[in-house]
Amino acid sequence: MQKILGYMRKAIQEFDLISDGDSIAVGISGGKDSLVLLNGLALLRRFIGIDYRLVGITLDPQFKGTPGDFSSVAGLCSGLDIKYHIIQTHIGEIVFDIRKEENPCSLCARMRRGALHDAAKQYGCNKIALGHHYNDAIETFIMNLFNEGRIGCFSPKSYLSRKDITS
């Protein structure tokens, strides 16, 4: 974990990702990427010299109409003294039952991102942190190339003016 914290600290400083007084919504899927990010940001608060607040947010798409079980994530957030919110959505129903998408990933991702932005604003956050790794970046690059005919990937920091939030 020490090596990961070093990488996180370097990225925070190099890309000016966190400032004093920031309130950061951490998107938590329950997977290893988002949980490592959450733990890392919680640990860094102790010694990085930047005062910031963390809010954990999980979007439950309720695939097949069934709510997810995020009790282990809730327990982790409680142990880290991080407020945690589960947002029940109808994304699964919209993507699969109403729209009947043949390639659901893009629509699902856009809907989740929009719902996360709304939730972050609702809970007073000015920034959103998402856990990604190299495989995510490569997958995004290839999907953009084949599906949209463009070369591109996500940047470490972006600003969404219509929501006044940094992601």
Predicted regions and their residues:
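ATP-dependent adenylation/nucleotidyltransferase module used to activate substrates
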Residues: 1-151, 155-156
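Short, flexible loop segments at boundaries between secondary-structure elements
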Residues: 153-167
